[in-house]
Curated annotation (Swiss-Prot):
Functional description taken from the UniProt entry: Specifically methylates the guanosine in position 1516 of 16S rRNA.
Family note: Belongs to the methyltransferase superfamily. RsmJ family.
Record protein name field: Ribosomal RNA small subunit methyltransferase J
Protein's organism: Neisseria meningitidis serogroup B (strain ATCC BAA-335 / MC58)
Keyword Cytoplasm: yes
GO cellular component terms, semicolon-separated: cytoplasm
Keyword rRNA processing set for record: yes
GO molecular function, one term: 16S rRNA (guanine(1516)-N(2))-methyltransferase activity
Catalysed reaction, written as an equation: guanosine(1516) in 16S rRNA + S-adenosyl-L-methionine = N(2)-methylguanosine(1516) in 16S rRNA + S-adenosyl-L-homocysteine + H(+)
Keyword annotations: Cytoplasm, Methyltransferase, rRNA processing, S-adenosyl-L-methionine, Transferase
Database matches in InterPro entries: 16SrRNA_methylTrfase_J, SAM-dependent_MTases_sf
Subcellular location: Cytoplasm
EC class name: transferase
Amino acid sequence: MTDILIDNTATETVRTLIRAFPLVPVSQPPEQGSYLLAEHDTVSLRLVGEKSSVIVDFASGAAQYRRTKGGGELIAKAVNHTAHPTVWDATAGLGRDSFVLASLGLAVTAFEQHPAVACLLSDGIRRALLNPETQNTAAHINLHFGNAAEQMPALVQTQGKPDIVYLDPMYPERRKSAAVKKEMTYFHRLVGEAQDEAALLHTARQTAKKRVVVKRPRLGEHLAGQDPAYQYTGKSTRFDVYLPYGTDKG
């Protein structure tokens, strides 16, 4: 489990949010590694010995740019956003792609299984709902804490299948800015890199009605060594499209 240091300045709203996740409250930072810090109205990820931190903030920086420019992104084409599909993001992480998809007006169900990451994302969505510039987009995201491969089959029984299942398995970041590299260092140290890619892709293809979209590096290997039906390729990123089992078009 991840430690969380709750500062005296932490609001009651933040304290309530934290209690929804299996985190370990501590009175001081650990001697090494990463931990969460709750202070004022924000939860952040810290790495012992580093001054910088990671928070989920959809109203500024790169997230703001992607939110306002999202309609022209390759991801929009990959999910065929003009058809207004429902999207289940099975690997939400810090929620950037979920937010871009939601900014397109799509209904996004986001799954995140790591409690610390889910806490960071939940906090980011909460603050986005309070900001006039981001509240409409944030309202399109429904966050589920848990393993997507385990939760999706049960959710299908109550909500039906989504049009799209979106996957963004972690992979090494190359040719990125120093800020992005540092953030990914924090993230990888927190959650590790072990993922059962084959099982995740299998469940996604069982779940989606129209297509499974997988984000990869432009020159990266196919997920679980499985060839996609077709691809959308950009300068640094590629989206591989897999069809649901038993279908011949997406």
